[in-house]
């Protein structure tokens, strides 16, 4: 069972975001700072804390979504991502979600596609004038359709 618990615990969010395994896959390697205007959720998988998922409303009804999974929870990443889509579909009125992954972070790119996001394109030298970043998005309707096609019976 996967559950999401809203959190405003900045220390917890930063501890996860600055975990060496999280930083290794981050876009710029600088670590993570808590952002007060972001909605954070603790992820629990079968009762065990597995990381943080979050979104920030970049435009009205557009959520920039990201995940920070601890190593022991990564085997559940697809299930967590799909459950998070179900959660925000049920609890918000978003119209579109976006995300991005550094070109060097192939796992992040694969993950975005695996949970139903569509590749939009790549912006060269997006991070610090060095790293290229690939952007992904999906509308609410596209995610609902994806979830219907990829639900377990």
Model-assigned labels for residue ranges:
Residues 74-90, 114:
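Conserved acetyl-CoA-binding loop-helix of GNAT-fold acetyltransferases
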Residues 60-72, 100:
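Conserved acetyl-CoA binding element of GNAT-fold acetyltransferases
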Residues 100, 118-134:
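Conserved catalytic-core motifs of GNAT/GCN5-like acyltransferases
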Residues 23-41:
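Active-site rim helix/loop that mediates acceptor-substrate recognition in acyltransferases
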Residues 98-110, 126-127:
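Conserved beta-strand-loop-alpha-helix junction that forms the acyl-donor binding cleft
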Residues 38-51:
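Conserved beta-hairpin
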Residues 1-8, 141-153:
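Conserved N-terminal entry element of GNAT/NAT acetyltransferase domains
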Residues 1-28:
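Short amphipathic alpha-helix that is part of the acyltransferase structural core
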């Amino acid at each position: 069972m996967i559950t999401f618990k809203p959190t405003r615990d900045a220390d917890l969010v930063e501890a996860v975001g600055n975990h060496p395994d999280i930083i290794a896959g981050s876009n710029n390697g600088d670590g993570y700072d808590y952002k007060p205007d972001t909605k954070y959720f603790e992820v629990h998988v079968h009762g065990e804390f597995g990381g943080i998922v979050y979104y920030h409303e970049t435009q009205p009804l557009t959520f920039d979504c990201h995940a920070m999974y601890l190593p022991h929870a990564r085997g559940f990443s697809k299930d967590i991502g799909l459950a998070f889509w179900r959660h925000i579909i049920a609890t918000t009125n978003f119209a579109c979600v976006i995300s991005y992954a550094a070109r060097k972070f192939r796992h992040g790119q694969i993950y975005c596609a695996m949970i139903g996001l569509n590749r939009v394109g790549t912006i060269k030298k997006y991070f610090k004038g060095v790293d290229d970043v690939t952007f992904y998005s999906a509308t609410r309707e596209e995610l609902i359709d994806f979830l219907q096609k990829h639900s377990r019976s």
